[in-house]
Regions:
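Bacterial N-terminal signal peptides that target proteins for export
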Residues: 2-14
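Bacterial N-terminal signal peptides
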Residues: 12-22
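Electrostatic cytochrome c docking/interface patches
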Residues: 25-43
């Protein structure tokens, strides 16, 4: 069968799939190597510690005044339920009182921070 745009069903499905994947895919991850986790720690200390705290519990000096409270990265259940893609999106775009880091941190730096915050729940 041909669609109204002149595509047969198979070509239409392939084209639609490519378009869908290209608009929803998250950029390539940085590997959670010890080196990248260490770099993520340095970035976390510079950009995240004031709200999320030194131990990732969301109890940093600036975080105490925020509502809702910053995410507690030590909550093993919550962290296990979070996908890397979802956390990366929240770091990138921000959420609630948390600012977006899309323009403040490079993509690989955001992945490094993500890998570091995962260490709090281990």
């Amino acid at each position: 069968m041909t669609t109204r745009f002149g595509f047969n069903d198979a070509r239409f499905i392939v084209l639609a799939s490519v378009l869908l994947l290209s608009t929803t895919a998250v950029a390539q991850k940085v590997e959670p190597s010890p080196e990248n986790i260490s770099k993520g720690e340095a970035i976390y200390k510079k950009h995240c510690l004031m709200c999320h705290g030194a131990t990732g519990m969301g109890d940093g000096p600036a975080g105490k005044r925020l509502n809702p409270k910053p995410y507690n990265f030590q909550d093993k259940e919550k962290m296990a339920a979070e996908t890397d893609e979802h956390l990366f999106k929240e770091i990138t775009k921000g959420k609630g009182p948390m600012p977006a880091f899309e323009r403040k941190l490079k993509e690989d730096e955001r992945w490094m921070v993500l890998h570091y915050i995962r260490t709090f729940a281990k």
